[in-house]
Design a protein with these regions (language model features):
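N-terminal glycine-rich anion-binding loops that anchor highly charged ligand groups
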Residues: 30-49
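Glycine-rich tight-turn/loop motif centered on a GG-T
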Residues: 48-65, 114-134, 164
């Protein structure tokens, strides 16, 4: 049987660009699949808002995200990308998070460079960890991977706080740390990300 990570990588290769549609629950996932989408996304805000009626302010736990993920992956065969916020702790916790996501048949995750008490990416006054700490998060995620095809994406919120040059500088470091892909948060124009 083909792993979810391999399905996600194939979807990226076959669809340039790949539109990854948001699905906050199994029903939305099934509707997205029926509509012909090739991959799904569950955001941290989606878990906080749809499952708990809470804002996206680092309130949800690994178990909350894993449960919502399992419900979606059991309802559809589409590869699922999950927002794991800052990874739910230090290096050992990040490694555990990756193992839990793989066990839930998740295809990919993105981990971000905000401080642990993060804010929704579209909100002002975000604080970021330094590049070294974020690189360590990525390395812990890569080390926790038990399926080499599992896709690890690094998200940076640096555009809002450091501008495009700062975001690009961080992205270079994150790829060097082992990230398979990048997510530039809150960039408002496709012309800005043509690099």
């Amino acid at each position: 049987m083909e792993s979810p990570g391999k399905k996600f990588r194939e979807a990226i290769a076959d669809n340039n660009p790949l539109m990854v549609v948001g699905a906050v629950n199994a029903y939305c996932a099934k509707m997205a699949e029926k509509a012909g989408h090739k991959a799904l996304y569950l955001s941290g805000a989606g878990v906080a808002n749809a499952s708990f009626g809470l804002p996206d302010l680092a309130i949800t736990t690994l178990n909350d995200v894993a449960e919502d993920s399992r419900r979606i992956t059991q309802a559809t065969d589409l590869p699922l990308l999950i927002d794991i916020d800052t990874g739910f702790g230090g290096a050992f916790s990040i490694s555990r998070t990756i193992k839990e996501m793989i066990a839930a048949d998740v295809a990919a995750v993105h981990i971000e460079d905000q401080v642990t008490q993060k804010r929704c990416g579209h909100r002002p006054n975000k604080s970021l960890v330094d590049k070294i700490e974020m690189s360590d998060r990525i390395k812990a995620a890569v080390d926790g991977r038990t399926d080499e095809s599992f896709f690890i994406m690094a998200r940076t919120d640096a555009y809002a706080t450091e501008g495009m040059e700062g975001a690009i500088d961080r992205c270079k470091e994150y790829i060097a740390a082992g990230a398979d892909g990048l997510f530039l948060e809150a960039v408002h124009s496709l012309s800005l990300i043509h690099i």
